[in-house]
UniProtKB/Swiss-Prot annotation:
Name by which UniProt lists this protein: Phosphoglucomutase, chloroplastic
Transit peptide: 1-63
Reported regulation of activity: Inhibited by the Calvin cycle intermediates fructose-1,6-bisphosphate and ribulose-1,5-bisphosphate.
Gene assigned in the entry: PGMP
GO terms for biological process, alphabetical: carbohydrate metabolic process; detection of gravity; glucose metabolic process; response to cold; starch biosynthetic process
Amino acid sequence: MTSTYTRFDTVFLFSRFAGAKYSPLLPSPSFTLSTSGIHIRTKPNSRFHSIIASSSSSSVVAGTDSIEIKSLPTKPIEGQKTGTSGLRKKVKVFMEDNYLANWIQALFNSLPLEDYKNATLVLGGDGRYFNKEASQIIIKIAAGNGVGQILVGKEGILSTPAVSAVIRKRKANGGFIMSASHNPGGPEYDWGIKFNYSSGQPAPETITDKIYGNTLSISEIKVAEIPDIDLSQVGVTKYGNFSVEVIDPVSDYLELMEDVFDFDLIRGLLSRSDFGFMFDAMHAVTGAYAKPIFVDNLGAKPDSISNGVPLEDFGHGHPDPNLTYAKDLVDVMYRDNGPDFGAASDGDGDRNMVLGNKFFVTPSDSVAIIAANAQEAIPYFRAGPKGLARSMPTSGALDRVAEKLKLPFFEVPTGWKFFGNLMDAGKLSICGEESFGTGSDHIREKDGIWAVLAWLSILAHRNKDTKPGDKLVSVADVVKEYWATYGRNFFSRYDYEECESEGANKMIEYLREILSKSKAGDVYGNYVLQFADDFSYTDPVDGSVASKQGVRFVFTDGSRIIFRLSGTGSAGATVRIYIEQFEPDVSKHDVDAQIALKPLIDLALSVSKLKDFTGREKPTVIT
């Protein structure tokens, strides 16, 4: 094999010629590391292997017997504060100097040696702009730090749920997920990276805090001098004791779904001529999964998958499955002769939106309905769920299911890691968040396709004895039957995206001042206060405490108003207001949620003085 060496006086791990812009249509850039006077192996514009003719076959390519490791000097870079959703910034930030390389090395500096030395790690992402280049950077630094094996999805593709599934199935020590979730992608937009542990769940704060601390003191990056890996073909490449296996991104995840659900039952529903199905992959990662699962295995029509090709910029769209950003799907579902069931997933495949014909299912209702029907409709839960949980802002619909089924119930802060602890302790089976995240203990991430298959299972179970020509039990029928049994929790969320951080934070501080003066019995218009607080949670598994998780006003009739700032964007702050009102009267269940909630919405805007603090007249998104 011919090696190419280049000497740089000052070079960067991801460098660009001054003033030049990278196009995915141009040759891939070489990868180097910031240092001075050090020879660094780079890969020019060519494949270094000609290995596999068929992507479905597997091959082993041997490199050198050993690899050379370089210790390259670097300096701390500001702005690498890491949360459980990882690190998210504009992609241009990650492409500067050693920004990504510093964070990856800081991660290895934060992990116990046994968690990565000679270990197996998984690598994949949602296919957004910069993922392929970042994959090469991560692989070389992993090899430089003594990792034994990297399992990487073909073309760098692995949905977040699939990463969790692969980690668990292959008993890997952890995995990197390259994604900014539902945030836009492309040269001008967002990129992100996070690390999941051996259970498949996001790294805890003890690790993310260490990562941030190490980014402030980092002085060197350990990098292996190996060529770029060909990610376009399934196969194994070895360099000494280090190997990279490019894996099919779908197979392990599909196998898990076949274990969880009755595919024959679902296939029977999707094969009916009187049942219409539509899935919008939003040009995001689930496009790689939709055809193999829904079409090839479950018999859905090929044209039932829309926006099914993953694109680096998500087709110039915003891959957030809600009524605003999934408008194409919504328009189809609200036609007179629209499909019976529609769903969408987000950038990295962990969120979902469910629709019936002219009917939207709120995420809060969705998880409650799945839980109420799981034992009958889903083989994985045949023995019954172990427990149920929701994030604090999510409506109380799930609480009532837990009460009726006599199941343990948990209310946790926003963040999937809180569910993971309960799952690992055997206390939790089904959980969800109002932010279109639903899942179970089959993995340790929320799972968009799992939620779609759960709903298809419920509909298939309800319609298994429905004869051709008879009316099918619809999505709306299932939801309204649930409301009649448990009552309806009217729920809405107002998102004000990319607000000035200063004004948004001042608004939250103002609300906390109100909390300090509030007491039970205070009157807010037609509502009487039961209590007001800043939500705090003590984990029943490890005793850890999460405080300041959302300002909430809870009234005596069960109504709630909640205020939170979201940190999942790459710029500014997103103010979220959650409004909920319980209605037991069946005759009032068909009222539009925005009408039913208007008095509470007006109260929330008045109490918070949102317009004064943020200058915003209207929300960016209403859910």
